[in-house]
């Protein structure tokens, strides 16, 4: 598959593991990923992608979001016994951001995604011509900044 769906699924599984280990503060970014991926399986004939595979990816993201309550119940900095025992396998916040970055860059490069309302919503605060361009610029430069997060939030606002 051109967009590396299996690669995407593997990254999501790692991200899910990270959230279980307490990286709950990255969950709001995964909400945006859900918004980006979900329309793909509805337009899969245009993109030439397998609808059931994209649906599986979307479901994996929503499962990840379902962990929010579980993690919140355990408390912000709480590490489970299992996590403490397997600390050498734990994932850092920086790795979580890198995973999210890779996923977003994969999505931006999906044929047709550039033209969707999720990545190309116009916003007067944005200096570049599209959210996709700005997001890619920020992420390629290694700047996971408020600016990069701002365009994700701007995309969300444009839906409402």
Curated annotation (Swiss-Prot):
Main localization, broad class: host cell
Subcellular localization: Host cytoplasm
Superkingdom: Viruses
Any one Gene Ontology cellular component term annotated for this protein: host cell cytoplasm
Keywords: Host cytoplasm
Quaternary state and interactors: Homodimer.
Protein's name according to its UniProt entry: Protein Bel-3
């Amino acid at each position: 598959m051109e967009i590396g769906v299996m690669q995407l699924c593997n990254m999501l599984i790692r991200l899910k593991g990270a959230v279980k280990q307490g990286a709950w503060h990255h969950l709001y970014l995964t909400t945006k990923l859900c918004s980006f991926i979900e329309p793909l399986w509805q337009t899969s004939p245009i993109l030439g992608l397998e609808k059931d595979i994209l649906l599986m990816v979307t479901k994996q993201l929503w499962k990840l979001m379902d962990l929010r309550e579980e993690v919140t119940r355990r408390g912000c900095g709480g590490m489970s016994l299992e996590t403490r025992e397997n600390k050498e396998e734990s994932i850092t916040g920086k790795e979580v951001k890198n995973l999210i970055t890779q996923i977003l860059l994969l999505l931006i490069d999906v044929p047709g995604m550039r033209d969707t309302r999720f990545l190309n919503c116009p916003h007067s605060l944005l200096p570049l011509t599209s959210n996709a361009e700005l997001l890619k610029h920020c992420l390629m430069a290694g700047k996971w900044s408020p600016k990069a997060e701002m365009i994700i939030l701007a995309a969300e606002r444009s839906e409402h």
